[in-house]
Swiss-Prot record:
Subunit structure of this chain's protein: Homotrimer.
Species of provenance: Synechococcus elongatus (strain ATCC 33912 / PCC 7942 / FACHB-805) (Anacystis nidulans R2)
Catalyzed reaction equations: a UDP-3-O-[(3R)-3-hydroxyacyl]-alpha-D-glucosamine + a (3R)-hydroxyacyl-[ACP] = a UDP-2-N,3-O-bis[(3R)-3-hydroxyacyl]-alpha-D-glucosamine + holo-[ACP] + H(+)
Keywords of the record: Acyltransferase, Lipid A biosynthesis, Lipid biosynthesis, Lipid metabolism, Repeat, Transferase
Role noted for this protein: Catalyzes the N-acylation of UDP-3-O-acylglucosamine using 3-hydroxyacyl-ACP as the acyl donor. Is involved in the biosynthesis of lipid A, a phosphorylated glycolipid that anchors the lipopolysaccharide to the outer membrane of the cell.
CDD domains hit by this protein: LbH_LpxD
Gene3D superfamilies from the UniProt entry: Hexapeptide repeat proteins, MurE/MurF, N-terminal domain
Protein name, per record: UDP-3-O-acylglucosamine N-acyltransferase
Entries under SUPFAM superfamilies matching the protein: Trimeric LpxA-like enzymes
Length: 355
């Protein structure tokens, strides 16, 4: 693919961009990081990568750059074709999609699959080996079910969903269009509901459902539990990393992102575009406002306002946490100073004449 063709494909995905070819129309065959790229590959640079010096060293044949005239001039000095956009990382993601097509099995049903006669399958569905589809399931068009997927009775999957190997979707779960569920995930299992009694624990049946809206992605070995009543809902375009746990009855907004090992207890309400970094824990029925951010390992026990950035355990405003952390690192020094000060005061007290 020539540089000029590549730009046409890229603009079709991201919209208009500014581009410049210094020396001809090079042949391109792939993408790579700027410090690893070889001849024939496209690479990118943004202000956050810290790799700006690689413009003079990279073997890449073309670059995706931020709107920075200095960087563009450095690329031109090496006769490298470049394009610029306000979001170079997004353009690079689109560039990957130009050259790389993920594995997609052909439509059809593997002979080892077990499909209940009452299940409804759409057009061009791919059903892999040993898949089990329960009674009254409804599968949309262009859905892919990889090997060993299990759909309990009454599950619905929207068009173009992809369910990876060894995932399980429990009864009556509703999965929207364009959702991706990665290997080992469990959607709609029973929530952790028990009532204490004199003799132990009384199990509360979990009669609710799980709803994933359009474009949700669930990482490997994650779990989203159904509630005793009502629903656990994940908003459109929300992305969950591997090993994320969503407790029963949680309400997650749209376009949220939760990194690995995030854990939400039951009944948590999360607004839109919230970011929870790795290993964040959220206590029962906590509310988190739109666009809030919690840094890694934060422990959230109370309400978080919209737009807030919190850190630490228990979670506090990030600026306060940074100041506290700076003091914490100096505690041994401060302790020694305080101990010396106490000793000096004690000596002064001993030397002071009694009245």
């Amino acid at each position: 693919m020539r540089w000029s063709e590549f730009l046409q494909h890229l603009e079709a995905k991201t919209g208009p961009c500014t581009a410049k070819a210094i020396a001809g129309d090079p042949e391109l065959h792939g993408v790579a990081a700027i410090n690893e790229a070889q001849s024939g590959q496209v690479s990118f640079l943004d202000q956050e990568s810290g790799l700006q010096d690689w413009i003079e060293q990279t073997a890449a044949s073309a670059l995706i750059l931020p709107p920075d005239p200095a960087l563009q001039a450095r690329a031109e000095a090496r006769n490298l074709p470049w394009m610029t956009t306000a979001q170079p990382r997004l353009a690079f993601a689109a560039a990957i999609a130009v050259f790389y097509q993920p594995f997609r099995p052909v439509a059809g049903i593997h002979p080892s699959a077990v499909i209940d006669p009452s299940a409804q399958l759409g057009d061009r569905v791919s059903v892999g080996a040993h898949v089990v589809i329960g009674a009254n399931c409804v599968i949309g068009n262009d859905v892919i079910l990889h090997a060993n997927v299990v759909l309990y009775p009454g599950v619905s999957l929207g068009d173009r969903c992809q369910i990876h190997a060894n995932s399980t979707i429990h009864e009556r779960s509703q999965i929207g269009q364009d959702c991706v569920i990665h290997s080992g995930a469990v959607i709609g299992a029973e929530g952790f509901g028990f009532v204490p009694t004199a003799s132990g624990w009384f199990k509360m049946e979990q009669s609710g459902i799980v709803v994933l809206e359009d474009g949700v992605e669930v990482g490997c070995n994650s779990a989203i539990d159904r509630p005793a009543v009502g629903e656990t809902r994940i908003g459109a375009q929300t992305k969950l990393d591997n090993l994320v746990h969503i407790g029963h009855g949680c309400q997650i907004g749209k376009a949220c992102a939760m990194a690995a090992q995030v854990g939400l207890a039951g009944g948590v309400e999360v607004g839109d575009r919230v970011i929870l970094a790795g290993q964040v824990g959220v206590a029962n029925r906590v509310k988190i406002g739109d666009r809030a951010i919690a840094s890694s390992k934060s422990g959230i026990h109370g309400e978080i306002e919209a737009g807030a950035i919190v850190s630490g355990y228990p979670a506090i405003p990030n600026r306060q946490w940074l100041k506290t952390s700076a003091v914490y690192n100096r505690l041994p020094e401060l302790y020694r100073s305080l101990r010396n000060l106490i000793r000096r005061v004690e000596v002064l007290e001993q030397d002071r004449p009694s009245s």
